[in-house]
């Protein structure tokens, strides 16, 4: 696999129904509101057709590392309420598949995400910092799971007072904190790379 190609499988287990999960995750425009730690801005480019596919959105996203990603998604397959598939283009290109399976009062959620990083920073440094970029993705998805639980609680609230009692979703990490964390992690990754390279030369 080329250094700039990534394959992530994320698993969440959330109390609710497949319909509830699909109604939240199938709406890219709402991501900016309920998953603000990652989705900084979302602009709808085209609505879905009657079959629920063709919806397109332009996104600005970030993790805890001090860089942003500009990309577009299009929903290309709809299996409501059991999931959907999307294609991505821009700073990364590839395909994502969401799958929802009911298990009693819970929903097992799987996100299969295969992409190539096309942002110049990621393309040029993936050979060295791929573990760091992977950790950045895992952090983003962990934020998503927490934010999804909070969004479901808000939607289920039966009064405005109950809705206000639900904590807000975690917001984006500041660039100052991200720079410190990213610098420490990058230094550690670079040191590990140099050690491995030195050992291979012996």
Where are these regions (language model features)?
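Hydrophobic ligand-binding cavity/cleft-lining segments
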Residues: 1-50, 191-202
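Terminal "cap-and-tail" regions of soluble proteins that handle hydrophobic small molecules
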Residues: 2-4, 14, 103-202
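Short, surface-exposed charged micro-motifs
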Residues: 11, 74, 97-99
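Hydrophobic pocket/interface hotspot
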Residues: 20-25, 31, 57-59, 75, ...
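Surface loops and adjacent helix of pleckstrin homology
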Residues: 36, 89, 112
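Glycine-rich portal/gate segments that line the openings of hydrophobic small-molecule binding cavities
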Residues: 43-95, 106-108, 143-147, 151-158, ...
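A short, polar/proline- and glycine-enriched secondary-structure boundary/capping micro-motif
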Residues: 68-70, 95-99, 119-125
């Amino acid at each position: 696999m080329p250094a700039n190609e990534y394959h992530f499988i994320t698993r969440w287990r959330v109390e609710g129904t497949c319909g509830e999960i699909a109604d939240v995750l199938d709406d890219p425009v709402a991501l900016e509101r309920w998953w603000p730690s990652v989705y900084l801005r979302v602009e709808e480019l085209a609505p879905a057709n009657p079959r629920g596919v063709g919806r397109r959105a332009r996104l600005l996203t970030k993790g805890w590392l001090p860089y942003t990603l500009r990309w577009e998604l299009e929903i290309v397959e709809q299996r409501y309420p059991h999931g959907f598939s999307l294609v991505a283009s821009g700073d990364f290109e590839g395909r994502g598949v969401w799958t929802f399976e009911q298990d009693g009062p819970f929903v097992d959620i799987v996100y299969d995400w295969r992409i190539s990083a096309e942002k110049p920073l990621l393309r040029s440094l993936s050979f060295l910092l791929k573990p760091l970029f992977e950790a950045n993705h895992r952090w983003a998805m962990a934020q998503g799971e927490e934010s999804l639980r909070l969004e479901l609680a808000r939607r289920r609230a039966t009064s405005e007072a109950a809705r206000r009692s639900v904590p807000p979703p975690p917001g984006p990490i500041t660039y100052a904190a991200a720079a410190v964390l990213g610098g420490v992690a990058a230094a550690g990754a670079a040191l590990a790379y140099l050690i491995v390279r030195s050992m291979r030369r012996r």
